[in-house]
From Swiss-Prot:
Protein name according to UniProt: Apolipoprotein C-II
Primary location group: secreted
Pfam families hit by this protein: Apo-CII
Gene name per UniProt: APOC2
Compartments, as annotated in UniProt: Secreted
Classification of source organism: Eukaryota, Metazoa, Chordata, Craniata, Vertebrata
GO CC terms: chylomicron; high-density lipoprotein particle; low-density lipoprotein particle; very-low-density lipoprotein particle
Length: 101
């Protein structure tokens, strides 16, 4: 490596080091505030709760016992079929990976 490259690398590292120190000092001067992640989590949580409440109200308005029974039956049949096909797929993958003995 050339001396110019090493000099440029040292200067870049020095500038980055001063940037980090300056950022830490400016953060220490400010009063503590809630972190951005906490604010985002609270915002998403409130949106989720309002959407969940709206969906619950809509479900209660349009509740039909016959439709509910059909949906439950459809769910149980589809999960049974998926578990069967998942088992078949798993067996096929294992036989391909294992190879012939």
């Amino acid at each position: 490596m050339g001396t110019r490259f090493l000099l440029a690398l040292c200067l870049v590292l020095l500038v980055l080091g001063f940037e980090v120190q300056g950022a830490q000092l400016s953060q220490q001067d400010e009063p503590p505030s809630p972190a951005l992640l906490t604010q985002v989590q609270e915002s998403l949580s409130s949106y989720w709760e309002s959407a969940k409440a709206a969906a619950q109200k809509l479900y209660q308005k349009t509740y039909l016992p016959a439709v509910d029974e059909k949906l439950r039956d459809l769910y149980s049949k589809s999960t049974a079929a998926m578990s069967t096909y998942t088992g078949i797929f798993t067996d096929q993958v294992l036989s391909v990976l294992k190879g012939e003995e």
